UniProtKB/Swiss-Prot annotation:
GO terms for biological process: histidyl-tRNA aminoacylation; L-histidine biosynthetic process. This is ATP phosphoribosyltransferase regulatory subunit. It comes from Bordetella petrii (strain ATCC BAA-461 / DSM 12804 / CCUG 43448). Keywords: Amino-acid biosynthesis, Cytoplasm, Histidine biosynthesis. Pathway: Amino-acid biosynthesis; L-histidine biosynthesis; L-histidine from 5-phospho-alpha-D-ribose 1-diphosphate: step 1/9. GO terms for cellular component: cytoplasm. The gene is hisZ. It is found in: Cytoplasm. This function is generally fulfilled by the C-terminal part of HisG, which is missing in some bacteria such as this one. Belongs to the class-II aminoacyl-tRNA synthetase family. HisZ subfamily. NCBIfam families: PRK12292.1-1, PRK12421.1. Gene3D superfamilies: Bira Bifunctional Protein, Domain 2. GO terms for molecular function: histidine-tRNA ligase activity. Heteromultimer composed of HisG and HisZ subunits.
Length: 385
Protein backbone atom coordinates (compact mmCIF):
# COMPACT_ATOMS: atom_id res chain seq x y z
CA UNK A 1 0.00 0.00 0.00
CA UNK A 2 1.34 3.43 -0.95
CA UNK A 3 2.30 5.77 1.86
CA UNK A 4 0.29 8.50 0.15
CA UNK A 5 -3.08 6.80 0.66
CA UNK A 6 -5.46 8.51 3.09
CA UNK A 7 -7.50 6.73 5.78
CA UNK A 8 -10.94 5.53 4.80
CA UNK A 9 -13.66 8.20 4.48
CA UNK A 10 -11.13 11.06 4.41
CA UNK A 11 -10.24 13.08 1.32
CA UNK A 12 -8.17 16.00 0.09
CA UNK A 13 -10.00 19.12 -1.07
CA UNK A 14 -8.70 20.34 -4.44
CA UNK A 15 -8.43 24.00 -5.52
CA UNK A 16 -11.82 24.61 -7.17
CA UNK A 17 -13.77 22.99 -4.32
CA UNK A 18 -11.56 24.58 -1.66
CA UNK A 19 -12.21 28.01 -3.18
CA UNK A 20 -15.96 27.40 -3.21
CA UNK A 21 -15.89 26.28 0.43
CA UNK A 22 -13.85 29.30 1.52
CA UNK A 23 -16.14 31.69 -0.35
CA UNK A 24 -19.14 30.14 1.38
CA UNK A 25 -17.43 30.33 4.77
CA UNK A 26 -16.71 34.04 4.40
CA UNK A 27 -20.18 34.84 3.05
CA UNK A 28 -21.99 32.93 5.79
CA UNK A 29 -19.94 34.31 8.68
CA UNK A 30 -20.56 37.81 7.32
CA UNK A 31 -24.28 36.98 7.14
CA UNK A 32 -24.30 35.80 10.76
CA UNK A 33 -22.61 39.02 11.81
CA UNK A 34 -25.51 41.01 10.31
CA UNK A 35 -27.77 39.18 12.78
CA UNK A 36 -25.48 40.16 15.67
CA UNK A 37 -23.66 36.84 16.12
CA UNK A 38 -20.12 36.94 17.52
CA UNK A 39 -17.46 34.57 16.18
CA UNK A 40 -15.70 32.16 18.56
CA UNK A 41 -12.99 29.56 17.86
CA UNK A 42 -12.69 26.72 20.41
CA UNK A 43 -9.74 24.28 20.25
CA UNK A 44 -9.75 21.17 18.08
CA UNK A 45 -8.89 18.93 21.07
CA UNK A 46 -10.15 19.01 24.68
CA UNK A 47 -10.16 16.79 27.73
CA UNK A 48 -12.80 14.18 27.06
CA UNK A 49 -14.80 14.85 30.23
CA UNK A 50 -15.21 18.50 29.23
CA UNK A 51 -15.84 17.76 25.56
CA UNK A 52 -18.69 15.35 26.27
CA UNK A 53 -20.27 17.18 29.23
CA UNK A 54 -24.04 17.27 28.98
CA UNK A 55 -24.18 15.21 25.77
CA UNK A 56 -25.56 11.77 25.04
CA UNK A 57 -23.85 8.50 24.19
CA UNK A 58 -24.10 9.20 20.45
CA UNK A 59 -21.47 11.95 20.60
CA UNK A 60 -19.21 9.75 22.72
CA UNK A 61 -19.28 7.04 20.05
CA UNK A 62 -18.45 9.58 17.33
CA UNK A 63 -15.47 11.06 19.21
CA UNK A 64 -11.88 9.99 18.44
CA UNK A 65 -9.84 9.67 21.64
CA UNK A 66 -6.13 9.86 22.45
CA UNK A 67 -3.85 10.26 25.46
CA UNK A 68 -2.35 13.66 26.30
CA UNK A 69 1.42 13.13 26.60
CA UNK A 70 1.71 16.12 28.94
CA UNK A 71 -0.94 15.21 31.51
CA UNK A 72 -1.70 11.55 30.85
CA UNK A 73 -5.41 12.38 30.65
CA UNK A 74 -7.70 11.29 27.84
CA UNK A 75 -8.29 13.85 25.10
CA UNK A 76 -11.04 13.92 22.51
CA UNK A 77 -10.92 15.34 18.99
CA UNK A 78 -14.17 17.25 18.71
CA UNK A 79 -16.96 15.59 16.75
CA UNK A 80 -19.32 18.54 17.26
CA UNK A 81 -18.47 22.14 18.13
CA UNK A 82 -21.81 22.93 19.79
CA UNK A 83 -20.87 21.66 23.30
CA UNK A 84 -17.65 23.68 23.12
CA UNK A 85 -19.54 26.85 22.24
CA UNK A 86 -21.98 26.13 25.07
CA UNK A 87 -19.03 25.87 27.45
CA UNK A 88 -17.73 29.24 26.23
CA UNK A 89 -21.10 30.89 26.85
CA UNK A 90 -21.69 29.31 30.26
CA UNK A 91 -18.20 29.34 31.72
CA UNK A 92 -16.05 31.96 29.97
CA UNK A 93 -18.35 34.75 28.77
CA UNK A 94 -20.73 34.33 31.73
CA UNK A 95 -23.14 36.98 30.45
CA UNK A 96 -26.54 37.56 32.03
CA UNK A 97 -28.57 38.35 28.91
CA UNK A 98 -28.91 36.95 25.42
CA UNK A 99 -25.69 35.88 23.70
CA UNK A 100 -25.41 35.05 20.01
CA UNK A 101 -22.35 33.03 18.99
CA UNK A 102 -21.26 31.58 15.65
CA UNK A 103 -18.34 29.35 14.70
CA UNK A 104 -16.65 27.45 11.89
CA UNK A 105 -14.07 24.70 12.23
CA UNK A 106 -13.05 21.15 11.43
CA UNK A 107 -14.64 18.24 13.31
CA UNK A 108 -13.67 14.57 13.09
CA UNK A 109 -15.92 11.53 13.42
CA UNK A 110 -14.66 8.14 14.54
CA UNK A 111 -16.94 6.55 11.93
CA UNK A 112 -18.75 8.02 8.93
CA UNK A 113 -22.48 8.61 9.36
CA UNK A 114 -23.16 6.49 6.27
CA UNK A 115 -21.42 5.12 3.17
CA UNK A 116 -21.61 8.48 1.38
CA UNK A 117 -20.35 10.65 4.26
CA UNK A 118 -16.89 11.85 5.20
CA UNK A 119 -15.38 11.50 8.67
CA UNK A 120 -13.96 15.03 8.45
CA UNK A 121 -16.47 17.88 8.34
CA UNK A 122 -16.10 21.64 8.19
CA UNK A 123 -18.83 22.57 10.64
CA UNK A 124 -20.39 26.02 10.62
CA UNK A 125 -23.22 27.06 12.88
CA UNK A 126 -24.87 29.61 15.14
CA UNK A 127 -26.34 29.43 18.65
CA UNK A 128 -28.56 31.72 20.75
CA UNK A 129 -28.20 31.50 24.54
CA UNK A 130 -30.30 33.07 27.26
CA UNK A 131 -33.82 33.15 25.78
CA UNK A 132 -36.30 30.33 26.36
CA UNK A 133 -39.10 31.75 24.19
CA UNK A 134 -39.95 30.60 20.70
CA UNK A 135 -38.68 33.93 19.34
CA UNK A 136 -35.13 32.54 19.54
CA UNK A 137 -36.21 29.42 17.66
CA UNK A 138 -37.77 31.59 14.96
CA UNK A 139 -34.61 33.67 14.61
CA UNK A 140 -32.52 30.52 14.23
CA UNK A 141 -34.90 29.12 11.61
CA UNK A 142 -34.82 32.43 9.71
CA UNK A 143 -31.03 32.34 9.76
CA UNK A 144 -31.07 28.74 8.50
CA UNK A 145 -33.21 29.77 5.53
CA UNK A 146 -30.96 32.77 4.82
CA UNK A 147 -27.94 30.45 5.02
CA UNK A 148 -29.14 28.11 2.30
CA UNK A 149 -30.46 31.03 0.23
CA UNK A 150 -26.99 32.60 0.31
CA UNK A 151 -25.64 29.33 -1.11
CA UNK A 152 -28.16 29.50 -3.95
CA UNK A 153 -30.63 26.88 -2.74
CA UNK A 154 -34.28 27.43 -3.56
CA UNK A 155 -37.39 25.86 -2.05
CA UNK A 156 -35.81 23.85 0.79
CA UNK A 157 -38.02 21.88 3.16
CA UNK A 158 -37.87 22.13 6.94
CA UNK A 159 -39.00 19.09 8.93
CA UNK A 160 -39.90 19.76 12.57
CA UNK A 161 -39.97 17.46 15.57
CA UNK A 162 -40.11 17.68 19.37
CA UNK A 163 -38.59 15.03 21.66
CA UNK A 164 -41.05 16.07 24.35
CA UNK A 165 -43.72 13.92 22.71
CA UNK A 166 -41.77 10.69 23.18
CA UNK A 167 -40.41 11.82 26.55
CA UNK A 168 -43.91 12.43 27.93
CA UNK A 169 -45.14 9.02 26.73
CA UNK A 170 -42.18 7.23 28.31
CA UNK A 171 -42.34 9.21 31.56
CA UNK A 172 -45.95 8.09 31.99
CA UNK A 173 -44.97 4.40 31.82
CA UNK A 174 -41.92 3.34 33.90
CA UNK A 175 -41.82 -0.07 32.20
CA UNK A 176 -41.42 1.60 28.80
CA UNK A 177 -38.95 4.18 30.16
CA UNK A 178 -36.62 1.33 31.12
CA UNK A 179 -36.22 0.62 27.39
CA UNK A 180 -35.82 4.26 26.35
CA UNK A 181 -32.63 3.74 24.31
CA UNK A 182 -34.09 0.78 22.42
CA UNK A 183 -37.36 2.60 21.78
CA UNK A 184 -35.61 5.72 20.49
CA UNK A 185 -33.55 3.63 18.07
CA UNK A 186 -36.63 1.78 16.82
CA UNK A 187 -38.51 5.05 16.36
CA UNK A 188 -35.67 6.61 14.38
CA UNK A 189 -35.69 3.55 12.11
CA UNK A 190 -39.51 3.67 11.95
CA UNK A 191 -39.52 0.01 12.93
CA UNK A 192 -43.15 -0.56 13.95
CA UNK A 193 -42.82 -4.39 14.10
CA UNK A 194 -39.78 -3.95 16.33
CA UNK A 195 -41.74 -1.71 18.70
CA UNK A 196 -44.56 -4.25 18.82
CA UNK A 197 -42.12 -7.08 19.53
CA UNK A 198 -40.48 -5.09 22.34
CA UNK A 199 -43.85 -4.50 24.00
CA UNK A 200 -44.82 -8.15 23.61
CA UNK A 201 -41.50 -9.43 24.93
CA UNK A 202 -41.50 -7.21 28.02
CA UNK A 203 -45.11 -7.65 29.00
CA UNK A 204 -45.00 -4.79 31.49
CA UNK A 205 -45.44 -1.99 28.98
CA UNK A 206 -49.01 -0.72 29.06
CA UNK A 207 -51.17 -1.32 25.99
CA UNK A 208 -51.89 2.40 25.48
CA UNK A 209 -48.16 3.19 25.64
CA UNK A 210 -47.34 0.47 23.11
CA UNK A 211 -50.10 1.72 20.80
CA UNK A 212 -48.88 5.33 21.01
CA UNK A 213 -45.27 4.38 20.29
CA UNK A 214 -46.31 2.28 17.30
CA UNK A 215 -48.38 5.17 15.98
CA UNK A 216 -45.52 7.69 16.09
CA UNK A 217 -43.60 6.47 12.99
CA UNK A 218 -46.70 7.12 10.90
CA UNK A 219 -47.12 10.67 12.15
CA UNK A 220 -45.16 12.47 9.48
CA UNK A 221 -46.13 14.73 6.60
CA UNK A 222 -47.49 18.25 6.42
CA UNK A 223 -48.52 20.53 9.30
CA UNK A 224 -51.88 18.73 9.52
CA UNK A 225 -49.99 15.86 11.17
CA UNK A 226 -50.24 17.79 14.44
CA UNK A 227 -54.02 17.57 14.40
CA UNK A 228 -53.80 13.85 13.75
CA UNK A 229 -51.32 13.50 16.61
CA UNK A 230 -53.72 15.19 19.03
CA UNK A 231 -56.31 12.60 18.04
CA UNK A 232 -54.04 9.52 18.12
CA UNK A 233 -51.73 10.14 21.07
CA UNK A 234 -52.46 10.10 24.83
CA UNK A 235 -53.78 13.37 26.28
CA UNK A 236 -50.68 13.95 28.40
CA UNK A 237 -49.60 17.49 29.40
CA UNK A 238 -46.11 16.94 27.98
CA UNK A 239 -47.49 15.75 24.65
CA UNK A 240 -49.85 18.72 24.41
CA UNK A 241 -47.08 21.21 25.29
CA UNK A 242 -44.76 19.76 22.64
CA UNK A 243 -47.46 19.84 19.95
CA UNK A 244 -48.34 23.43 20.93
CA UNK A 245 -44.68 24.45 20.55
CA UNK A 246 -44.57 22.94 17.06
CA UNK A 247 -47.84 24.62 16.11
CA UNK A 248 -46.51 28.02 17.22
CA UNK A 249 -43.54 27.67 14.86
CA UNK A 250 -45.76 26.57 11.97
CA UNK A 251 -48.19 29.47 12.52
CA UNK A 252 -45.29 31.96 12.52
CA UNK A 253 -43.83 30.71 9.20
CA UNK A 254 -46.77 30.51 6.76
CA UNK A 255 -44.63 31.05 3.65
CA UNK A 256 -42.11 28.28 4.38
CA UNK A 257 -42.42 24.66 3.25
CA UNK A 258 -42.70 22.85 6.57
CA UNK A 259 -43.14 19.22 7.48
CA UNK A 260 -43.55 17.31 10.74
CA UNK A 261 -41.97 13.96 11.65
CA UNK A 262 -42.66 13.00 15.26
CA UNK A 263 -40.38 9.95 15.11
CA UNK A 264 -37.31 11.87 13.89
CA UNK A 265 -35.80 12.15 17.37
CA UNK A 266 -32.09 12.19 16.66
CA UNK A 267 -30.26 13.66 19.65
CA UNK A 268 -33.06 12.55 21.99
CA UNK A 269 -30.79 12.67 25.04
CA UNK A 270 -29.51 16.11 24.05
CA UNK A 271 -32.43 18.15 22.72
CA UNK A 272 -35.14 19.60 24.95
CA UNK A 273 -37.49 21.43 22.59
CA UNK A 274 -38.35 21.98 18.94
CA UNK A 275 -35.81 20.36 16.59
CA UNK A 276 -35.52 20.61 12.83
CA UNK A 277 -33.77 19.26 9.76
CA UNK A 278 -33.51 21.00 6.40
CA UNK A 279 -33.65 19.01 3.17
CA UNK A 280 -32.93 20.16 -0.36
CA UNK A 281 -32.78 18.59 -3.80
CA UNK A 282 -29.30 17.24 -4.53
CA UNK A 283 -28.47 15.98 -1.02
CA UNK A 284 -29.29 12.44 0.11
CA UNK A 285 -29.97 13.37 3.72
CA UNK A 286 -30.47 16.42 5.95
CA UNK A 287 -28.27 19.35 4.99
CA UNK A 288 -28.84 21.41 8.15
CA UNK A 289 -29.93 20.24 11.58
CA UNK A 290 -30.53 21.90 14.91
CA UNK A 291 -32.95 22.68 17.68
CA UNK A 292 -33.33 23.57 21.33
CA UNK A 293 -31.05 22.11 24.02
CA UNK A 294 -31.76 23.95 27.27
CA UNK A 295 -30.18 21.42 29.64
CA UNK A 296 -26.66 21.06 28.19
CA UNK A 297 -25.09 24.11 29.85
CA UNK A 298 -26.10 22.76 33.27
CA UNK A 299 -23.06 20.46 33.02
CA UNK A 300 -20.86 23.58 33.01
CA UNK A 301 -22.42 24.90 36.22
CA UNK A 302 -24.79 27.43 34.68
CA UNK A 303 -28.14 26.44 33.18
CA UNK A 304 -28.97 28.55 30.11
CA UNK A 305 -31.72 28.13 27.51
CA UNK A 306 -30.17 27.51 24.11
CA UNK A 307 -31.08 26.86 20.50
CA UNK A 308 -29.04 26.72 17.31
CA UNK A 309 -28.05 24.87 14.16
CA UNK A 310 -25.05 23.60 12.25
CA UNK A 311 -24.11 22.18 8.85
CA UNK A 312 -21.11 20.77 7.02
CA UNK A 313 -19.73 23.32 4.54
CA UNK A 314 -17.96 20.61 2.54
CA UNK A 315 -21.22 18.73 2.14
CA UNK A 316 -23.00 21.92 1.11
CA UNK A 317 -20.35 22.77 -1.47
CA UNK A 318 -20.36 19.28 -3.01
CA UNK A 319 -24.03 19.58 -3.93
CA UNK A 320 -23.73 22.98 -5.59
CA UNK A 321 -23.07 23.55 -9.32
CA UNK A 322 -19.35 23.78 -10.20
CA UNK A 323 -17.93 27.21 -9.58
CA UNK A 324 -16.86 29.22 -12.59
CA UNK A 325 -13.17 29.90 -12.99
CA UNK A 326 -11.98 33.25 -11.69
CA UNK A 327 -10.75 35.84 -14.17
CA UNK A 328 -7.14 36.91 -13.76
CA UNK A 329 -4.38 39.05 -15.23
CA UNK A 330 -1.29 37.39 -16.66
CA UNK A 331 2.00 39.18 -16.07
CA UNK A 332 5.63 38.37 -16.81
CA UNK A 333 8.07 37.74 -14.01
CA UNK A 334 10.75 40.35 -13.64
CA UNK A 335 12.66 42.63 -11.29
CA UNK A 336 11.61 45.82 -13.03
CA UNK A 337 10.39 48.29 -10.40
CA UNK A 338 7.67 49.67 -12.68
CA UNK A 339 6.35 46.14 -13.32
CA UNK A 340 6.31 45.38 -9.59
CA UNK A 341 4.43 48.63 -8.94
CA UNK A 342 1.85 47.83 -11.63
CA UNK A 343 1.29 44.32 -10.25
CA UNK A 344 0.99 45.65 -6.71
CA UNK A 345 -1.56 48.29 -7.78
CA UNK A 346 -3.73 45.69 -9.52
CA UNK A 347 -3.66 43.34 -6.53
CA UNK A 348 -4.60 46.16 -4.17
CA UNK A 349 -7.59 46.82 -6.43
CA UNK A 350 -8.70 43.22 -5.91
CA UNK A 351 -7.41 41.77 -9.18
CA UNK A 352 -5.81 38.32 -9.39
CA UNK A 353 -2.40 38.71 -11.03
CA UNK A 354 -0.54 35.53 -11.97
CA UNK A 355 3.11 36.04 -12.85
CA UNK A 356 4.55 33.46 -15.21
CA UNK A 357 7.84 32.20 -13.82
CA UNK A 358 10.74 31.91 -16.29
CA UNK A 359 10.56 28.82 -18.51
CA UNK A 360 6.94 27.98 -17.67
CA UNK A 361 3.71 28.47 -19.56
CA UNK A 362 0.51 29.43 -17.76
CA UNK A 363 -1.06 26.05 -16.85
CA UNK A 364 -3.29 26.70 -13.84
CA UNK A 365 -6.84 25.39 -14.24
CA UNK A 366 -8.22 27.62 -11.50
CA UNK A 367 -8.05 30.91 -13.43
CA UNK A 368 -8.93 32.32 -16.83
CA UNK A 369 -6.33 34.90 -17.79
CA UNK A 370 -8.36 37.25 -19.98
CA UNK A 371 -5.92 40.18 -19.72
CA UNK A 372 -2.18 40.58 -19.55
CA UNK A 373 0.32 43.19 -18.47
CA UNK A 374 2.46 44.33 -21.38
CA UNK A 375 5.18 46.94 -21.72
CA UNK A 376 3.92 49.52 -24.19
CA UNK A 377 5.62 52.82 -24.93
CA UNK A 378 7.71 52.45 -21.79
CA UNK A 379 4.73 51.84 -19.46
CA UNK A 380 3.07 48.67 -18.17
CA UNK A 381 -0.53 48.56 -19.37
CA UNK A 382 -3.38 46.05 -19.44
CA UNK A 383 -4.25 44.38 -22.73
CA UNK A 384 -7.32 42.23 -23.32
CA UNK A 385 -6.56 38.71 -24.57
Amino acid sequence: MGNWLLPESLADVLPAEARRIEELRRELLDLYRTYGFELVAPPLVEYIDSLLSGTGTDLNLRTCKLVDQLSGRTLGVRADMTPQVTRIDAHLLNRAGVTRLCYCGTVLHARPADLLSSRELLQIGAEIYGHAGFEADLEILSLVLDTVAAAGLRQPRLDLCHPGVVRAILDADPAAAAYAEDIVLLLREKDVPGLAELARRDGGIRADTAAALQRLPGLYGGPDVLQQARHDLPLLPGVAAALDALQAIIDAMPDVTLGVDLADIGGYGYHSGVTFALYAEGWHDALVSGGRYDDVSRAFGRARPATGFSLDLRKLARGLPPAGRARAVRAPWGQDAALAAAVRQLRRAGEIVVQALPGHQQSQDEFICDRELVLQDGAWTLRTL
